[in-house]
């Protein structure tokens, strides 16, 4: 059986997502001998690290067996040895970056959300389809052990008719007090294309779609939890205070059990 290498450029390789999730996963696949295909061949990923900071890229590349790295996106997209462009960079500008990769004939795999608007997301998907390249978006939560077990139980009708579902989904994001912030500001700042709704709803949407069924409608209220929110203006600092707490209550008339 043949062994084939496939070049994958990771845009945003030194960020938290690029390093701790995606690069680590690719290196694990490499150490296991690559991905076994249905034909019996093995596909070996060859990561190429891309970012803005040469020093960080060099350190990360050395720590992973002297991988190739670059700060030149155009050069990477022009490299015939690279077949896949993966974007783990800031959400803002992702359609432009991915669109350039599609135009260069690269398959694209993107962190979610793939765009800030539905129109931009659909346009990107259609451009990839017209170009004849593969396009994909992260849906890693589907493969978590707990959710795969949930799906098995659902398929066997273990739950019977499901009347209501509650999902608590998230993790701690520190603001620098008292613990250091561990998420880049573009991930949560609306001004830079971020936000909890845009970032997190994309996760649970594919979970429900793939595990339980199609979503017919969504109702959402978004609020900022930190009590003090500042917005700088040329003359002064504008302070806004939010004193209300957010309370989640889910009443229903479906019995928990039969008595």
Give the ranges of each region predicted by the language model.
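Beta-loop-alpha module in the N-terminal Rossmann-like domain of NAD(P)-dependent dehydrogenases
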Residues: 55, 63-127
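Predominantly a Rossmann-like dinucleotide-binding segment in NAD(P)-dependent oxidoreductases
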Residues: 141-243, 250-253
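Rossmann-fold dehydrogenase core element
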Residues: 123-141, 160-167
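N-terminal Rossmann-like dinucleotide-binding module
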Residues: 1-64
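Short active-site oxyanion
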Residues: 44-48, 83-85, 195
């Amino acid at each position: 059986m043949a062994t084939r290498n496939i070049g994958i450029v990771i845009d945003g390789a030194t960020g938290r997502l690029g390093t701790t999730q995606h690069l680590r996963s690719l290196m694990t696949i490499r150490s296991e001998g690559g991905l076994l295909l249905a034909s019996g061949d093995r596909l070996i990923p060859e990561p190429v690290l891309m970012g803005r900071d040469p020093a960080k890229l060099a350190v990360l590349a050395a720590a992973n067996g002297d991988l190739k790295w670059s700060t030149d996106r155009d050069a990477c997209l022009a490299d015939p040895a690279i077949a896949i462009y993966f974007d783990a960079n800031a959400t803002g500008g992702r359609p432009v970056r991915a669109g350039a990769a599609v135009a260069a004939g690269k398959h694209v795999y993107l962190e979610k959300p793939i765009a800030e608007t539905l129109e931009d997301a659909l346009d990107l998907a259609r451009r990839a389809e017209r170009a004849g390249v593969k396009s994909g978006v992260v849906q890693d939560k589907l493969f978590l052990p707990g959710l795969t077990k949930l799906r098995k139980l659902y398929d066997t009708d273990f739950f019977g008719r499901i009347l209501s579902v509650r999902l608590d989904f998230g993790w701690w994001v520190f603001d620098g007090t008292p613990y250091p912030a561990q998420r880049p500001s573009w991930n949560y700042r609306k001004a830079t294309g971020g936000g909890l709704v845009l970032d997190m709803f994309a996760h649970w949407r594919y979970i429900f779609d793939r595990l339980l069924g199609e979503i017919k409608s969504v109702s959402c209220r978004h609020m900022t939890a930190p009590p003090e929110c500042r917005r700088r203006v040329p003359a002064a600092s504008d302070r806004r205070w939010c004193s209300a707490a957010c309370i989640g209550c889910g009443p229903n008339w479906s019995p928990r059990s039969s008595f």
